[in-house]
Regions:
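Central hydrophobic cores of alpha-helical transmembrane segments in multi-pass inner-membrane proteins
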Residues: 5-20, 32-45, 89-103, 120-122, ...
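Membrane-interface helix-loop-helix modules in multi-pass inner-membrane proteins
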Residues: 61-87, 133-136, 140-148, 385, ...
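Hydrophobic alpha-helical membrane-insertion segments
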Residues: 33-50, 170-181, 373, 377-385, ...
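Alpha-helical transmembrane segments and their helix-start/interface "positive-inside/aromatic belt" motifs
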Residues: 25-36, 161-171, 370-375, 453-462
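Transmembrane helix-loop-helix hairpins at membrane boundaries of multipass inner-membrane proteins
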Residues: 2-3, 18-101, 105-115, 194, ...
């Protein structure tokens, strides 16, 4: 069996184990065992990949396997990874692992919750290892479907509205995406849906590219919270349970940026060159609009949700700059934001679980009451605003340096506008930290609250270690990513 298939097999075994498990301890045991195995497998895969590259293996995708699945449509179960895929698998495994501990005390319907959570995880892992267009789309849909139930059943606030809005908008994006994928397949004249073989043929007519590229980019862009299709994201984040928000913002939204780069840009480079300016304007709006919107929110989850719109907009913005440095920064930003936003949502969930409010106006003085959670919140905020030594700094600096390499007025003007988001982010992060962590607590019920439990500390410490590790030692992963973006970027250079 191909090693990559482990990332689909383990979630399947977890589903079977959860189905058979009786009692909360057995359910937790299945989840911890499965999530730990996935994390170990992703770390092993990372070292295997780096070892292959060090040994001189220059293949675009490593550890490939192809099994014909449905001959009439040339659909295969085709898997393979490059540095981008490996990084995304590692991110996904970290967040599934920490999300398991963040959901440790979730009640009721614990078994059903973890069944859907595991199915969502399987869709994410399957998407990142797939190199067949149809298989990618299948896993993409598997990842989206559980969101409706996870938010609608276990969410809070206007959960039914948020779940339906999220589902309808993302399924609308999926319709665009399916049309785009079919257009790519038939337009290329390929006898397979393997994206590497379609890229090698490189014969989709330019006129067709100009039709299928916008559809594909928009299809994935909806999931990446591209303006003006971002409105599902804040409502979905605000209503979702803690671990679902972590996986949703930390990983699921990254499927959008990954798909735009891996499929839309890679398979239709001429259209990407011709039409990128349109989407650059939209992504530039996402970056600034998301940051400004975060400034005026009073709900902790909405603040982080709009912050995610801004940061994910920056990912798409960098991809559209069509050069290696900016594209490398985009993938680093996907990693950095995935870790940071998962940390934020975990901490917000822990604070809400104690105070039963997410309203900034009702929170104050938490540093004296919950020092561990408060210090961790400060670290998350500093990473979000780009403090050197944490992951946000290296990702954003790589993006802006790469974006400024385009020496025309249009690209540089947009880059300067996007850079303003750094200042805006500092405004809402520092205001938020000062308001909820310091000052005098006026709610007497908050004075008796306890700090983080052991399971919460495991989740938070893991994420902080990853944020700091990526910020202080980024070279190995940036080098791995930089090599992998080159085959795509080389086709984009006019």
């Amino acid at each position: 069996m191909n090693f990559l298939s482990i990332f689909v097999l383990i979630p399947l075994l977890m589903l079977a184990g959860l189905w058979a498990a009786q009692g909360i301890k057995a359910i937790r045991g299945v989840m911890v065992t499965g999530a730990s195995t996935l994390l170990i497998a992703s770390i092993v895969l990372t070292f295997m990949y780096l070892g292959e590259r060090s040994a001189g293996n220059t293949a675009e995708m490593l550890f490939r396997a192809d099994t014909l699945w449905y001959a009439p449509l040339h659909i295969s179960y085709s898997v393979g990874v490059d540095g981008i895929s490996v990084a995304m698998l590692l991110l996904s495994a970290i967040i599934v692992f920490t999300g398991t501990f963040a959901s440790w005390r979730l009640q009721p319907l614990t078994k059903e919750y973890f069944l859907w959570f595991t199915l969502l995880s399987m869709g994410v892992f399957g998407f990142f290892i797939s190199i067949d267009l149809f298989t990618m789309f299948m896993f993409y849909e598997i990842a989206l479907i559980p969101m409706y139930l996870l938010i609608g059943v276990w969410g809070s606030g206007r959960k039914e509205y948020a779940a339906m809005k999220l589902t309808l908008m993302l399924m609308g994006g999926s319709a665009f995406l399916l049309i785009g994928i079919l257009g790519i397949y038939f337009g290329s004249g390929a006898t397979t849906m393997n994206l590497l073989e379609i890229a090698q043929l490189h014969n989709i007519p330019f006129a067709q590219q100009c039709i299928w590229f916008p559809l594909t980019f928009l299809g994935f862009g909806v999931l990446g919270a591209l303006f003006p299709f971002h409105t599902w994201s804040p409502d979905g984040h605000a209503s979702a349970p803690t671990a679902v928000s972590m996986l949703h913002a930390g990983v699921l939204m990254k499927l959008g940026g990954y798909g735009c780069f891996r499929i839309a840009m890679y398979l239709m480079p001429e259209a990407a060159n011709e039409l990128s300016w349109i989407f650059l304007i939209l992504t530039g709006i996402s970056v600034v609009y998301g940051a400004f919107s975060a400034c005026v929110q009073t709900d902790l989850k909405y603040i982080n949700a709009y912050s995610s719109v801004s940061h994910c907009g920056l990912v798409l913005f960098a991809i559209l700059m069509l050069n290696q440095t900016a594209a490398t920064g985009a993938i680093l930003q996907m990693l950095s934001h995935g870790l940071m936003t998962a940390l934020f949502f975990a901490l917000i969930g822990m604070i809400y679980g104690r105070t039963h409010t997410r309203d900034v106006r009702e929170l104050a003085g938490l540093m004296k009451i919950m020092p561990f959670l408060s210090v961790c919140y400060v670290i998350a905020g500093l990473a979000n605003l780009g403090l050197p030594g944490l992951s946000g700094f290296i990702a954003e600096m790589t993006i802006f340096v790469g974006s400024f390499q385009n020496n025309d007025v249009f690209h540089r003007t947009l880059t300067i506008i996007a850079c303003s988001s750094i200042v805006i982010t500092a405004v809402y992060i520092l205001r938020l930290v000062g308001k909820i962590l310091y000052g005098t607590c006026t709610n007497k019920h908050h004075l008796t609250l306890t700090d983080a439990t052991w399971d919460e500390r495991v989740a938070v410490i893991c994420l902080i270690a990853c944020v700091a590790g990526l910020g202080m030692a980024p070279f190995w992963i940036s080098h791995m990513i930089g090599e992998s973006v080159l085959p795509v970027v080389s086709q984009l250079i006019p």
